[in-house]
Every structure is written in structure tokens, then in C-alpha cells.
Amino acid sequence: MAKNKFNQSWLHDHINDPYVKLAQREGYRARAAYKLKEIDEQDKLIKPGQVIVDLGAAPGSWSQYVRNKLAASPRAKDGRIDGAIVAIDILPMEPVADVTFIQGDFREESVFQQLETIVLDATGGGKVDLVLSDMAPNLSGVASADAARMEHIAELAVEFAQAHLKPEGALLIKCFHGSGYSQIVEMFKRHFRVVAPRKPKASRDKSSETFLLGRQLKHPG
């Protein structure tokens, strides 16, 4: 019964959520687009001509937002974008115009190599400007296990950024306040000169979800 009441409460909040309504009106697949939008407006992350990687991209609202930003560039012509977007997720994702999508597990070597190949092609053998990660583990409710899973996902994103991000580039990841959060912050501080937590208004107040932004790699790969 308690679970049913929780589901009903969540459904009520979801239906009446202004960001859900805004996403439906503006054609975004999820309200998460507005989390990225707010952070981008604050930190000026997305700029014309960039190569951007979207980790944990499904259902695609972050890729949609990035695509819209790059398509708005004065240099974008014939309906194309000024830049490149590479997205990956273990789940399927409906196509987003101008976004190269890989379905696969980021942790598998063959999938990782496919991602690297596409990134190298998009950059002409160079580095990317921005790595976005909305990846999150399936939470078990066991704090220590969930913290370890979240930290592992953060490590994967940092390792990818270390190898493929421009020295002046940025990494934005989703994480959760609680057990293990301080370890993720310390890891970011080891790798980035500028580290800043972000809690956009579109992130629900009840949620422990937060975002961590790292800029300017200390030891680029």
C-alpha cells in the first residue's frame, strides 16, 4: 500500500511539474533538458563549432538541447549544425538530427573503441570540447553499494575526459549527495583546475541529484 501511495504521489508531481509541461510544449523528450539549459546559461558551456560527447544520452533531451544550440549558430547552414555531437547509451534512443548515436555499454572495450573511432573522426584526430554525462547506476537502496556504483561511473567519465578532452575543455556529470559524494569531488579536484557543484532549479528539491562541473584539465592525456 505504501508503495502504491508513493507511486501515486510521484505521478501527481510529475503530471503537474512545470518542466514536464514545458518539455512537452517545446518538444524535448524529458525535463532533464532544462537542467542542462540552466547550467549552460550559467557557465557558457556550449559554443558554436564544438565537438561534444553525451554519455548516458537516452532518451535524448540533452542531445536535443545541444543540437538546438549548435544549429542556432550563424555558421550553421542548410539546416545542419555548427559542430558535432556523439551520443552513447546502453538503452536505445530515437534518432536526433545531426547526432551520431551508439547503443552499447560504455564499459565494454568494443563499444569504447567504437566511441573513440567516431570521436577521432569528428575531431579530425583531435580532442573534444565538452563531455556531458547523465549516466546513473541502478540504485539498490544499499548506501555503500550505490556509492561505489556512482563513483565507478564518475571514474569512467573522468577517464574518458582525461584521454579525449581538450586541456581547456569541460566535463559535466550527474551524481548524488550522500555516501561517496565527497570522494567524487576530490577526484574532480585531482583532475581539474576548476570544480563547481551545480543544482539547477529543474532538479527536484526532494532529489539528492546534483551535478559536478570540472574545467581545465590539470594533466591532459
Curated annotation (Swiss-Prot):
Domain of life of the organism encoding this protein: Bacteria
Pfam families on file: FtsJ (PF01728)
Family: Belongs to the class I-like SAM-binding methyltransferase superfamily. RNA methyltransferase RlmE family.
HAMAP family listed in its UniProt record: RNA_methyltr_E
The keyword S-adenosyl-L-methionine is annotated on this UniProt entry: yes
Residues annotated for S-adenosyl-L-methionine binding in this entry: G60, W62, D89, D105, D134
Alphabetical keyword list: Cytoplasm, Methyltransferase, rRNA processing, S-adenosyl-L-methionine, Transferase
Function summary: Specifically methylates the uridine in position 2552 of 23S rRNA at the 2'-O position of the ribose in the fully assembled 50S ribosomal subunit.
GO cellular component, one term: cytoplasm
GO MF term set: rRNA (uridine-2'-O-)-methyltransferase activity
Organismal lineage: Bacteria, Pseudomonadati, Pseudomonadota, Betaproteobacteria, Burkholderiales
SUPFAM superfamilies on file: S-adenosyl-L-methionine-dependent methyltransferases (SSF53335)
Species this chain originates from: Ralstonia nicotianae (strain ATCC BAA-1114 / GMI1000)
Active site: K174
Catalytic activity: uridine(2552) in 23S rRNA + S-adenosyl-L-methionine = 2'-O-methyluridine(2552) in 23S rRNA + S-adenosyl-L-homocysteine + H(+)
Descriptive protein name: Ribosomal RNA large subunit methyltransferase E
